[in-house]
Amino acid sequence: MALKTFNPTTPGQRQLVMVDRSALYKGKPVKALTEGKHSSGGRNNTGRITVRFRGGGHKQTLRIVDFKRDKVDAPATVERLEYDPNRTAFIALVKYEDGTQAYILAPQRLAVGDSVVAGNYVDVKPGNVMPLGNMPVGTIIHNIEVKIGKGGQLARSAGTYAQLVGRDQDYVIIRLNSGEQRLVHGRCRGTIGAVSNPDHMNTSIGKAGRNRWLGRKPHNRGVSMNPIDHPHGGGEGRTSGGRHPVTPWGKPTKGKKTRSNKSTNKFILLSRHKRKK
């Protein structure tokens, strides 16, 4: 889908660049496939802010998206493509031959009327699901499982994909968008194709109010605060902080590694950080 620009009638319109969503379904989602969504405003169960700069925004309905695709060898027809406010990608409503419906992540080049299927050996075409070990090397994939049967976790955002670049005994090697190469078990499943809405990265918010509609509050810098609020706060006039960048709680930021899941390090063949050096 193409990008839309607008006549510069206001500064916000001048800067605004949106994805053209005119080809998407304009009605309401299937009620049986939705849930109510409570807005947390960045607060946890004790009412304290755990994620800063969140709150407000338009009320959203949660669409239940099928990331597992575990109806094996049951063809489904794409009924329509829909907008989903909870994610950057578009979703597709599919209907199985037994009459059940489901939402799936819409890949690029998936159209209304297309047939998709999940199985051990299926055609290599967008929207089909199969175990990674049965895919040909070089296949572009998304919605990739990391644990067998858990459902897709990798490459689910708009325009993202990974590539299957090799095999190693029971495992396959996939290359992610970040440049990281990692081992995933061959019985884990993935969906063929790249995720829809690749133009999302080229959009421009246009004005501050549009961020508020999305539930994002203004992000204040530490150096503009008082000393009570941030380690970088205070000083006469504008200052540069006077120390290496830290979080509001005094921990180093901007580059300090925070990954602690050492048990899965053995599956990372090429770190995304090594590539950048």
From Swiss-Prot:
Residues 199-277 are annotated as: Disordered. InterPro entries: NA-bd_OB-fold, Rib_uL2_dom2, Ribosomal_uL2, Ribosomal_uL2_bac/org-type, Ribosomal_uL2_C, Ribosomal_uL2_CS, Ribosomal_uL2_dom3, Ribosomal_uL2_RNA-bd_dom. Gene3D superfamilies: 2.30.30.30, Nucleic acid-binding proteins (2.40.50.140), Ribosomal protein L2, domain 3 (4.10.950.10). The keyword Flavoprotein does not apply. Signal peptide: none annotated. Residues 209-220 have a biased composition (Basic residues). One of its GO terms (biological process) is cytoplasmic translation. It comes from the Bacteria. Keywords: Ribonucleoprotein, Ribosomal protein, RNA-binding, rRNA-binding. The keyword Mitochondrion does not apply. GO terms for molecular function: RNA binding; rRNA binding; structural constituent of ribosome; transferase activity. PROSITE patterns: RIBOSOMAL_L2 (PS00467). Pfam families: Ribosomal_L2 (PF00181), Ribosomal_L2_C (PF03947). GO terms for cellular component: cytosolic large ribosomal subunit. Coiled coil: none annotated. Belongs to the universal ribosomal protein uL2 family. PANTHER family: LARGE RIBOSOMAL SUBUNIT PROTEIN UL2M, RIBOSOMAL PROTEIN L2. HAMAP family: Ribosomal_uL2_B. Part of the 50S ribosomal subunit. Forms a bridge to the 30S subunit in the 70S ribosome. One of the primary rRNA binding proteins. Required for association of the 30S and 50S subunits to form the 70S ribosome, for tRNA binding and peptide bond formation. It has been suggested to have peptidyltransferase activity; this is somewhat controversial. Makes several contacts with the 16S rRNA in the 70S ribosome. This is Large ribosomal subunit protein uL2. It comes from Bradyrhizobium diazoefficiens (strain JCM 10833 / BCRC 13528 / IAM 13628 / NBRC 14792 / USDA 110).
